[in-house]
Amino acid sequence: MVTIVLGAQFGDEGKGKITDLLSQSATLCCRAAGGHNAGHTIVHDNITYDFHILPSGLISPDCVNLIGSGTVVHVPSFFKELDALKAKGLKEADKRIFISDRAHVCFDLHSVVDGLEEADLAGKKVGTTGKGIGPCYSDKASRRGVRIGEVLEEGVAEDKLRSLEAGYRRRFGELQYDLEDEVKRFNEYRTKLQPYVVDQMAFLEKYRSCPSVLVEGANALMLDIDHGTYPYVTSSCTGLGGAIQGLTLNPTSIKSIVGVVKAYTTRVGSGPFPTEQINDIGEKLQSVGREFGVTTGRRRRCGWLDMVMCRYSNAINHYTTINLTKLDILDDFDEIKVAVAYKLDGRRLESFPAQLEVLDKVEVEYVTFPGWKSNTMGVTRWEDLPVNARRYVQFIEQEMGGVPIKWIGTGPARTHMIEREV
């Protein structure tokens, strides 16, 4: 049976920790979509691991890992990340990681084009990670991309890469890019990649009846190309639909869908953010929460928890349980606000609006809670949380339509987690 872990906000919710926890009992852990633009950190046995394209199930010694067909893979980053994990003690990691032959290749060329396209947008920049993800998915949609399996065929990837470069040169003029160097490296990767590349359909068939498959979502629902705050989104389907599509999942095999919700809201890059606090509150959340992007190092914008957004996310992803993260970051606040509705011209909106112009104008309606002003770092039992912290959690549960909050994160370590009976 399949468990899917999905971000409910703008990403950076802390999905890696619950994925790490669940992967301990998983036979197979999969990434379905996205690329090395994603990023999360896991602390295990006092060692900090940073993940981008690799599934975090690699930390579990008995878990096999797959990068699925809906992803885009920057091959140098794949090997660099794998080498970093091995250097930190995961010696057999390279024996437990595989890539779908249908995943697409993200070239250095795509990163160059990403920067040029952002520059063209001038004052309306999306705020991408600059990793080339958007141009890579564009090439995929335009049917001119290169699949991982094609790297293994002599001359195929090279011919397509040369064609891509010529097309971009016609569009942008001379590029700050060394085509021959990338061609040379991919000729070398042809042999190096061979042990990792699999036919996804045949590979997954072997695990069809296994009791525990874990799907690790990247980014989050509000960055989804269809359902997020378009155009300030990533270029892949980051919700439930993307997981099913990218891994050819049978929907009837899905046992649980875990929505990961940070106890406040953060966002990297540009785009609407109704509950953002551009004040001392936002600065405090940023500082105490150490809100810097794992992939880019950029400061994250911070604000109060937005239940309008979370309810919308739930309506699309159909969570069966919630993992609430970073509750301890709110320990020292006198009062804590939660957004429960948006108003436009004095009228409550029925749902999360699609139009950016509307989002920019909404008035946010908050419910204010008294803070608990005590240390919850490392708390592992529900009854040991302060009363006001428990009330905060229960209110979120109520606002999510009764979807139970099964896990509550109270610190960075794997052991800093409350697991409730729900």
UniProtKB/Swiss-Prot annotation:
Q: Which reaction does it catalyse?
A: IMP + L-aspartate + GTP = N(6)-(1,2-dicarboxyethyl)-AMP + GDP + phosphate + 2 H(+)
Documented EC number(s): 6.3.4.4
Question: Is the Flavoprotein keyword given for this protein?
Answer: no
UniProt cofactor(s): Mg(2+)
Q: How is its cofactor bound, per UniProt?
A: Binds 1 Mg(2+) ion per subunit.
Localization recorded for this chain is: Cytoplasm
Entry annotated with the keyword Metal-binding: yes
Check the record and name the Gene3D superfamilies matching this protein. Answer: Adenylosuccinate Synthetase, subunit A, domain 1, Adenylosuccinate Synthetase, subunit A, domain 2, Adenylosuccinate Synthetase, subunit A, domain 3
Entry's Gene Ontology cellular component terms: cytoplasm
- Supply the alphabetized keyword list: Cytoplasm, GTP-binding, Ligase, Magnesium, Metal-binding, Nucleotide-binding, Purine biosynthesis
Q: Give the family from UniProt.
A: Belongs to the adenylosuccinate synthetase family.
Protein name listed in UniProt = Adenylosuccinate synthetase
- Upper lineage: Eukaryota, Fungi, Dikarya, Ascomycota, Pezizomycotina
